[in-house]
Every structure is written in structure tokens, then in C-alpha cells.
């Protein structure tokens, strides 16, 4: 039996993903005036596919979804199909700032949940004192 029952590890992984997303968003904002810079986005689809493949599923019909493994947990994708500025840059500062705020709220919620788990363990270890 694990002391943390996997919750701490899941929270740690979620914090790592939020950190990666934060870095990509701030990089986009920092390059708002860079000519021909294309905004990047973190895609966790590979991670979702990987986790889905761990599910045990029985395929009883050819139309059912196939579950398969993938190698990487995330990818950073540049969106090169648009340009918002004359210099070829496609960073939308309003969109980036919104995503930054959402990511910060998510990160803070994860940190608070992690603190709650540790406080619960502390209470158990000190006997509620």
C-alpha cells in the first residue's frame, strides 16, 4: 500500500504540465513583436492517447475505437496558418493573456490541493494536534 495512493504523483504531473504550458504562453507573449513569429501551443493529446491506451477495453465490433500507445507525453505545435500583424506575426496578445490567466488559476488550484494533501498527512502524523 502506498502512503500517497498516487494522488501526490498525479498532482505533481499536473503541475509539471501547467509549468510547461506557462513557459510556452510566456514565450508567445515575449515574441509579440518578433517578425514572422508563429504562436505555439502545447498539445497533450499524446498524453491523453497514452493514458487511454492503459485502459483495458474489449473490442467486440470493428467500429469500436482502437487503443494504441504513443511515445511522447506532449508536443509543442506552432500555428502557422494565420497572421494578425503586418510583419507576419500571429500572436494574439488578448488570447495569450487569457490562456495565461486560466493556466495560473489552474496551477494555483493544483498547489492548494497538494497543500491540502500534505496538511492531511501532517494531521494524521501528529494525531490531530
UniProtKB/Swiss-Prot annotation:
Residue spans crossing the bilayer: none
Record carries keyword Cytoplasm: no
Keyword NAD found: no
Entry-linked InterPro entries: Flag_bb_rod_N, Flagellar_basal_body_rod_CS, FlgB
A single BP term in Gene Ontology: bacterial-type flagellum assembly
Pfam family, any one: Flg_bb_rod
Recorded GO CC terms: bacterial-type flagellum; bacterial-type flagellum basal body, rod
Cellular compartment(s): Bacterial flagellum basal body
Source taxon at top rank: Bacteria
Chief place where the protein resides: other
Disruption phenotype: Lack flagella. Altered cell surface properties including greater softness and lower density of the charged groups in the polymer layer.
Keywords: Bacterial flagellum
Subunit structure: The basal body constitutes a major portion of the flagellar organelle and consists of a number of rings mounted on a central rod. In Gram-negative bacteria, at least four rings, L, P, S and M are present, whereas Gram-positive bacteria lack the L and P rings. The rod consists of about 26 subunits of FlgG in the distal portion, and FlgB, FlgC and FlgF build up the proximal portion of the rod with about 6 subunits each.
Function description: Structural component of flagellum, the bacterial motility apparatus. Part of the rod structure of flagellar basal body.
Similarity field: Belongs to the flagella basal body rod proteins family.
Name of this protein: Flagellar basal body rod protein FlgB
This protein's encoding gene: flgB
